[in-house]
């Protein structure tokens, strides 16, 4: 019994070996006519193996396969000549089989490598080339195809990138993104479309080859059956991939629910809308944009029209001493020698483009620009401006009370000629700033040299430096300043403001930016946008400015400095404390009547109640 079993096993092995040699001989015969046939077949089998999660064994080299001595081969019809086979291939106009280009080889290999990544994860072109190079089926002929496609200008990675771009351009089979690594451009494959990527495989060529084999009677029935199964599986892969990618009903429900939740989250609530409206400028924005071209003539010349745009323009001031060949004045509006400067200066141009007699209809009246205010709320809400002309170094800060916001623009000693006096570093350190604040913010303007000194002063006064605001300076024509009056080595086109915090103040966070782009004006005058920013950050609190001038006085602010006009106090308690400390100093205005003060308080209360009801 055991003898019969061994004989059956040996007989089966012999039949398998004979069948294997028969198949290899037929493959070798076809390979001699169509060089790319075996590699295309291996690629298709590798794709099927990856989808079925089965190991893949490549076809061994077809070098010395002799025809097996089997009755099955003897029954085969006579093999036609090579000339007849080539003639039949030419008749069948198949570009894939007529000419195998290096691009088609690289496209097939890259497509197989991308399809074998289950699930798909992002991969870059260099990593993709390494995976192809380390594959056991990678032959020297394949490497030669990569080198031929890349040419002398690049390596195999360039060939991979050429194939990826070809896939993306032809049918959008891959989603690509370029990035740079060490100065070299690389491609990242973000996602793939398996249905479209399968079209890069030579399935059509295999199908036509099978038809030609049937006509030429090459191969036995088993091989034709295998080819038919491969083609059928390849055609069904698209349907399977589409079915896998299709979302289920539960996934669709989750997607719709998430979409509705996102819409609800992004919609501002009534409270958020009210808070946003609170910080809008009362009466609407008063801003009028400037045109990119300075004059109306330049604007008309660019547009080819007789009428310039509605934006603000300038007109050149040409005096008797002006030399147009010198160009624009570096300082423009801030020039200190306007009467003798030979450069060109500018002023705003309010004149209409055409006289009224030439216009069919009267032009719309220009909206009058109100005086620009830094505050976003009314004077009644803020209160009246107050100031004290004093020497801040020895002034009694304790009589002023506590403030929520402090802004200071000290006259730092920057070792340059300035039109005002400066303070020594030790005098800055010993200022009695801590008496003005327990909980709040301080905004300290510093120069380049005083940057670290300002941080030291903040720490000495009890503050923690948390932010830094940058003011980018522009000139009258809204261009970046290139010839500033400050700077030892380079012209300074910006200034810095250190922001310190003390205690636990109640402030509005993340409602403003740390960069301000604004036009320069008088010496040491800071942009008015600072006052609006501080009012938004800490609304309704008392605010004081140190080292102020008359142009710095604002509603709701207390200003201290030695260049102010006398003393103006409207707060009764503050007037009393100041009179007690400095009885010989005259205070303006005359002591306001209690009725006027009560009217001011009642108006503020009424506006507060109205806004609360809204």
From Swiss-Prot:
Keyword entries, A-Z: Methyltransferase, Nucleus, RNA-binding, S-adenosyl-L-methionine, Transferase
Leading EC class: transferase
E.C. number: 2.1.1.348
Catalyzed reactions per annotation: an adenosine in mRNA + S-adenosyl-L-methionine = an N(6)-methyladenosine in mRNA + S-adenosyl-L-homocysteine + H(+)
Binding site for S-adenosyl-L-methionine: 391-392, 409, 526, 549-552, 562-563
PROSITE patterns: MT_A70
GO biological process: methylation
Region (Positively charged region required for RNA-binding): 479-492
Comp. bias (Polar residues): 604-614
Composition bias, Low complexity: 67-78
Disulfide-bonded cysteines: none
Subcellular location: Nucleus
Similarity remark: Belongs to the MT-A70-like family.
PANTHER family recorded: N6-ADENOSINE-METHYLTRANSFERASE, N6-ADENOSINE-METHYLTRANSFERASE MT-A70-LIKE
Function: Putative N6-methyltransferase that methylates adenosine residues of some mRNAs. N6-methyladenosine (m6A), which is present at internal sites of some mRNAs, may play a role in the efficiency of mRNA splicing, transport or translation.
Protein name per its UniProtKB record: Putative N(6)-adenosine-methyltransferase MT-A70-like
Organism: Medicago truncatula
Lineage of producing organism: Eukaryota, Viridiplantae, Streptophyta, Embryophyta, Tracheophyta
